[in-house]
Amino acid sequence: MALNDLAAKEIFQNIDPDLDTLVGFSGGPDSTALLFGLHQLKINNRLNGKLAALHINHGINSQANAWESHCKQVAESLGITFFSEHVTIKSKSKSIEIEARNLRMEVFKAYSRDYKQICLAHHLDDQVETVLFRLFRGTGLRGITGIKLSRIIGEGFLIRPLLHTPKDALIDYLKSHNIDYLIDESNLDQSIDRNFIRKSVMPLIQSRWSAAANKIFDFSKLAHEEIEILDTLFENVYGHLFRSESLIKSELVNLDSPLRRKLIRHWLEFHKLPIPNLKILIEIEKTFLDSSSPNAEVQWSRSDDEQGVILRINKNEIYFEVI
């Protein structure tokens, strides 16, 4: 039961076959296709490390326990080691979706001690939705690069081997082999922004421009490549400024405004701090570079309120405090 050639090629190209692999398995169509695809590689001796599936039960939906049972049954039917973890959403002050994602990442980080390669089933359509969502919400150049193919998490890597594969290819594979998968009804709720983009915006766009999804995806890849080049050049010239613990006002005041803002963003990124939007960046410029108040400060936080920052100035040095 081979996954179609395109998806199978993408999976194999984007993973390390010698690492132990853990699949984030919700039971939905995407993660089901990924699990079966990796299982096919395993039985064909193209995946040398261990293969396991991890289901995270958020306990939100009334069907949550039934979904967990389904995932366990599927994994065991394939002879794949199965893990499940229950997480509890506590906060009511922020998006449930954001908190659920943060909790999942903590679980993945814990499992990275034993499984150095954690695979998630994001696909091309997810990438397109992410780019559009960020554009509509407001983002910079880095935001339009979308979802990363891979990144470090804990002691391993988080990889999305299907990121270049359209969802239709995954659905066709599942249907052609009569593979069951779960449907989360919340994904149909168009009061949720991403669902609205998926169910209403993209179909309308593609009814006019049939290749729109691929073009948006290619655009995000090109943006990523261009940003990498610019970052390298920028660091070669200005790296000594943003790698320090503080910014020196006298070294910034005579620079053009776009360059000053880029330096501030890179400085904050280097120290793994929340990146402010354009409005706050302009406020930072006015507060610290275009005036000289000794008690000035600018404060902001991440969109999920998990971390906040205050910038202050002491004579010629602009420094940060995490709150």
Label for each model-derived stretch:
Residues 137, 141, 167, 206-210, ...:
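Alpha-helix boundary/capping and short turn/kink residues
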Residues 171-214, 218-221, 225, 232, ...:
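Mid-to-C-terminal catalytic subdomains of enzymes
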Residues 65, 94, 191, 210-213, ...:
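Non-catalytic, surface-exposed connector residues within folded enzymatic/regulatory domains
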Residues 2-30, 48-52, 87-89, 103, ...:
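AMP-forming adenylation/ATP pyrophosphatase catalytic core
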Residues 37-44, 204, 267-270:
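Active-site catalytic microenvironments for nucleophilic, acid-base chemistry
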Residues 1-199:
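Core alpha/beta nucleotide-donor-binding catalytic domains of modification enzymes
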Residues 32, 129-130, 195-199, 213-217, ...:
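Non-catalytic, well-ordered alpha-helical scaffold segments
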